[in-house]
A protein has these predicted regions:
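A conserved mid-protein helix/loop that constitutes part of the nucleotide-sugar donor-binding site
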Residues: 31-39, 211, 215-238, 245, ...
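Conserved acidic donor-binding segment of nucleotide-sugar-dependent glycosyltransferases
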Residues: 326-327, 331-338, 347-353
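N-terminal strand-loop element at the rim of the active site
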Residues: 7-10, 15-16, 20-28, 32-87, ...
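Aromatic "clamp/platform" in nucleotide-sugar-dependent glycosyltransferases that forms part
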Residues: 275, 294
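A short helix/loop element that forms part of the nucleotide-sugar donor recognition site in Leloir-type
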Residues: 91, 190-206
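Short His-centered aromatic/hydrophobic patch
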Residues: 106-112, 131
Length: 405
């Protein structure tokens, strides 16, 4: 076993075993961020990565399989308060011990609770949780349980300053919190050379001869507030007839949103694209990126809009103001204020030259401030810090790790 040879191996060449635990493989923001970071960690050669999930479903599973990191373990949970939770927890603790996991890194509410409990019981020396959402839809009981997971962790990663400040208000020690912005995969947002706008529109079934405001957000969670987007769209359509509205995302809320579009009289102008595997081409063909969420942490969609060179109009929730330079790269509006959202969109559509300049400014900021390489560097430095501290093991023996430079 690796543990038995620790003191005869060259420690500088030892790679820590890192276990990521994600909720599912759905195309959600936290899942995509986790998969992107896991892919980078694996490619860096600095860690041996392992992956577990709570629900083995979603289109990102194929991407995970292509990494070649070994078996992906599912720990199916129905509740935190039944016998199955204890059963799955025992399985997790056994896996951690058998594979000598050095870092457990969890990425959302449910995995924070399950993963940190198992990692604590297994004595994992580096326990890292993530918080990527603001208040809005967690019950008081859920918040209390999540705070317990933070107490069991060594570090809590907040994906923006708003989330960091919320954690402090909730009683998490500031010394335990570290703030890392989401990383943006610029390669994913590159369009192929020579692509024409009309060609991109046709690929999505979008009629040419229109300008488009687009929203990229799942249709599973009501917190994304697509009804606000549609109400704003109806106002924009009344003022500027040649505008179309593209909704990229899948989920069970789609039919209800179709009905609402009909009630608003814009059913011929709204295009539900479903799951969108090629966001880059859609944004290339769009004129404005919109986000209407009631709550967010640090929205990946805003960064994607900026990287694609689009001006952004988004609700002022989570870290939106940390990404958007007000009046320079886009605008923020109060959640639920579809009238102001429509006014800002109309303003940009009526001033296309200024809108393009705002988009180009946002593109520069996205590349400089929110790169996935910076995110990887921050993560490796965090692991290095935690693993370099002597472990309080039953044997009383500690040692130091160093991730290869």
């Amino acid at each position: 076993m690796r543990a038995g040879n620790r003191f005869v191996e060259d420690l500088s060449q030892m790679k820590p075993n890192v276990l990521f635990i994600i909720d599912s493989f759905e195309q959600g923001g936290s899942e995509r961020q986790a998969m992107q970071l896991l892919t980078q960690l694996h490619a860096s050669g600095q860690c041996r990565v392992h992956l577990a999930c709570l629900q083995n479903r979603g289109s990102l599973r194929a991407e995970a399989d292509q990494l070649g990191i070994g078996e992906i373990h599912e720990y199916a949970l129905n509740s935190f308060y039944d016998l199955n939770f204890a059963k799955q927890l025992r399985r997790l603790v056994r896996f951690i011990k058998e594979n000598e996991i050095d870092v457990v890194h969890t990425h959302c509410f449910y995995t924070n609770i399950f993963g940190m409990t198992g990692a604590f019981l297994a004595g994992v020396r580096a326990r890292v949780t993530s918080k990527g959402e603001t208040d809005g839809f967690r019950s008081p009981m859920q918040k209390r349980v999540e705070r317990t997971s933070f107490r069991l962790s060594h570090r809590v990663i907040a994906n923006c300053l708003v989330v960091q400040n919320q954690l402090i208000r909730e009683g998490v020690s500031p010394a335990k919190i570290i703030q890392h912005y989401n990383g943006l995969n610029l390669e994913r947002l590159k369009v192929r050379s020579g692509l024409r706008r009309e060609e991109a529109l046709a690929a999505f079934g979008l009629p040419s001869g229109r300008r488009y405001m687009s929203i990229v957000a799942n249709l599973r969670n009501p917190v994304k507030d697509h009804p606000m987007f549609l109400r704003a769209a109806a106002r924009v359509r009344a003022a500027i007839p040649d505008v179309g509205f593209a909704i990229a995302g899948e989920g069970e809320l789609m039919e209800g949103l179709r009905e609402l579009a009909g009630q608003l009289g814009i059913e011929e102008d709204v295009f539900f694209l479903g799951r969108c595997d090629n966001v880059a081409d859609l944004l290339f063909a769009s004129d404005i990126g919109v986000l209407s969420s009631k709550a967010e942490g640090f929205a990946n969609a805003i960064l994607e809009y900026m990287a694609a060179g689009l001006p952004v109009v988004a609700t002022d929730v989570g870290g939106a103001r940390e990404a958007i330079a007000e009046g320079e790269t886009g605008y923020t509006v109060a959640s639920g204020n579809d009238e102001l959202m429509a006014a800002r969109i109309i303003e940009l559509l009526n001033e296309p030259k200024r809108a393009r300049a705002m988009g180009e400014r946002g593109k520069l900021i996205a590349a400089e401030k929110f790169s996935c390489d910076r995110h990887l560097k921050n993560t490796l430095e965090l692991y290095d810090e935690l693993l370099s501290k002597p472990k309080s093991a039953p044997t009383g023996i500690g040692h130091e790790w160093r991730l290869n430079e």
